[in-house]
Amino acid sequence: MKKLLVFLILGIVTISCQAEEIDDRQVLQVTAVQRGHILSEMRTLLSGTQAILIALAKEDMVAVSRHAKALGMGMARKAENSLKGTLPKAFMQLGMAAHQDFDQIATDAESIHDPKHTLRQLSQSMGKCIVCHESYQISTLKSL
């Protein structure tokens, strides 16, 4: 009973601390369509990264290259024009750098054929995702 009480108290304290945490990330104000596009791209990057990890587990470097290529600059160019003037330069640079990373992962998977090398590249690239998510939050502009 004492353990349960301690657990409940710790849970309440933890929740209280989290509720008071201030979100000091930069707010990016975009239209609902733009927000949907950005979030869709992020989900595509996440599912593509999972596909790369599955291929790496099988040591299928051809599949690694194919999945990485799909996340490269070709994917970025589809959205660049509609978002370029709306989003901060630093945000866009992080995104472009991540897409360039995937092109490099694809190239190296084809030429080097080393799953550990690819894992190191993927880990480094995911650091950009972390920086972005720690720095920005996306909000929809309110219609008048």
Question: Locations of the language-model features?
Answer:
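Sec-dependent signal peptide recognition
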Residues: 2-8
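Sequence context surrounding c-type heme c attachment/ligation sites in exported
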Residues: 20-144
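Hydrophobic h-region of N-terminal signal peptides that target proteins for export
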Residues: 10-17
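Generic cytosolic/nucleocytoplasmic N-terminal low-complexity/intrinsically disordered segments
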Residues: 1-2, 127
